[in-house]
Amino acid sequence: MRLAAASNEAYAASLAVSELLSCHQCGGDRGQDEELGIRIPRPLGHGPSRFIPEKEMLQVGSEDAQMHALFADSFAALGRLDNITLVMVFHPQYLESFLKTQHYLLQMDGPLPLHYRHYIGIMAAARHQCSYLVNLHVSDFLHVGGDPKWLNGLENAPQKLQNLGELNKVLAHRPWLITKEHIEGLLKAEEHSWSLAELVHAVVLLTHYHSLASFTFGCGISPEIHCDGGHTFRPPSVSNYCICDITNGNHSVDEMQVNSAGNASVSDSFFEVEALMEKMRQLQECREEEEASQEEMASRFEMEKRESMFVFSSDDDEVTPARDVSRHFEDTSYGYKDFSRHGMHVPTFRVQDYCWEDHGYSLVNRLYPDVGQLIDEKFHIAYNLTYNTMAMHKDVDTSMLRRAIWNYIHCMFGIRYDDYDYGEINQLLDRSFKVYIKTVVCTPEKVTKRMYDSFWRQFKHSEKVHVNLLLIEARMQAELLYALRAITRYMT
């Protein structure tokens, strides 16, 4: 009997300790592992994005079969549910297409071996100093049997991959300078030469990861908890803090102050939305009343192209790449320069002469079957995606605005649509929005939360993520057009 009583007392004491250490909301234990000498990492950020408060992230209910299927597919393909996926899920139709395309590029049958694919992803992401993507693909590269020595620097990779460095550099920062000579140098490099099919696969991977770096910075994607910069071993500052508090809105004081400060300008941002709606209505009326001549539209394109040179942010300083990223590429000083620099003449790229639908799509599909169709589907979803809403307004036709954003990006790259009136861009896109667009597309490593917050202040975060989807797909298409045109010229 005494043994039974002692056992009951020990059990009761154990329950009392567990009660003290457990969280009443999630049932988890606090501190027990630390007492056992185990260092437990804690996430540094609150949720998958530094720009979007976690309480405003899309919550997936247990009844949402489509979302759960997407998450399951992502986890099965990548072995993880990364923060990019958790932000893109605002737009499930796009996310499904994105995951399908990325899975095909990285894991399905194709011209390049698996470890080459991940290494090219590392090279592309490193050009924009995107340590988030570099870290993810370093893990994937090693997982598929890649040689760890290659990760010590590009000079330790095979000469064939080193030769790709020049194309990676120009494609990432000044794609309009790509010529058929770049292509010829890769295809005729003796024992280190690329086949046409391999090169198309590499080009698609490079453009995919240049653009994904833009999304990563543009949405302020936080590092995964297991990656550098994603965790800390310091104890929380509040003794009764639990990890479940993150999902309950227990954010830092600074974040709450930022949110309250943002509310002060609600009335101003409300009028911005109304003004944009009115401009769209007026432009639609003008379209119906009169149409500009071809000469006038060509003149407006040149004017917009020149004006885009003077769009830059006050934070437009050089960003020195960290050693752990810069070792994956050469010529670290090479970066973006405006298409229309003084003393430098580059002919305008006319979509009428070479376009994705009539030329690029068929070339990619011929040399890398099925990929052209996947990319084309992704372009169309991003371009046509709409919920017919603008901030608090419903039943709005946003096609005019989406086209202005897409064509402005292509204009910055010197790409012109003969049937588009570029005068609409200045009417629809204000300076703060142009600064954000140009930074995300051309120098994404310089994007700040202030830039993200300063444009379309009354719009929902899901709408800003939608903008970023437009930006990255327009950028990817622009890069592909220049690279594929050079390949076509080499072939003919």
Swiss-Prot record:
GO molecular function: L-leucine binding; oxidoreductase activity
Region called C-terminal domain, residue ranges: 321-492
Tissues in which the UniProt entry reports expression: Highly expressed in heart and also detected in liver and skeletal muscles (at protein level).
UniProt catalytic activity: a hydroperoxide + L-cysteinyl-[protein] = S-hydroxy-L-cysteinyl-[protein] + an alcohol
Transmembrane segments annotated in the record for this chain: none
Coiled coil regions in record: none
GO cellular component, one term: cytoplasm
Gene3D superfamilies given in the database record: AhpD-like
Knockout mutant characteristics: Triple knockout mice lacking Sesn1, Sesn2 and Sesn3 do not display an embryonic lethal phenotype since they are born at an expected Mendelian ratio. Moreover, they are not distinguishable from their wild-type littermates. However, their survival at 10 days is dramatically affected. This is associated with a constitutive activation of TORC1 signaling in the liver, heart and skeletal muscle during postnatal fasting, that occurs between birth and suckling.
Domain of life per record: Eukaryota
Record carries keyword Cytoplasm: yes
Cellular localisation: Nucleus; Cytoplasm
One of the Pfam families matching this protein, by short name: PA26
PANTHER family: P53 REGULATED PA26 NUCLEAR PROTEIN SESTRIN, SESTRIN-1
Role played: Functions as an intracellular leucine sensor that negatively regulates the TORC1 signaling pathway through the GATOR complex. In absence of leucine, binds the GATOR subcomplex GATOR2 and prevents TORC1 signaling. Binding of leucine to SESN2 disrupts its interaction with GATOR2 thereby activating the TORC1 signaling pathway. This stress-inducible metabolic regulator may also play a role in protection against oxidative and genotoxic stresses.
Assembly description: Interacts with the GATOR2 complex which is composed of MIOS, SEC13, SEH1L, WDR24 and WDR59; the interaction is negatively regulated by leucine. Interacts with RRAGA, RRAGB, RRAGC and RRAGD; may function as a guanine nucleotide dissociation inhibitor for RRAGs and regulate them. Interacts with KEAP1, RBX1 and SQSTM1; in the SQSTM1-dependent autophagic degradation of KEAP1. May interact with PRDX1.
Domain remark from Swiss-Prot or TrEMBL: The N-terminal domain may have an alkylhydroperoxide reductase activity. The C-terminal domain mediates interaction with GATOR2 through which it regulates TORC1 signaling.
Protein name: Sestrin-1
Organism of provenance: Mus musculus
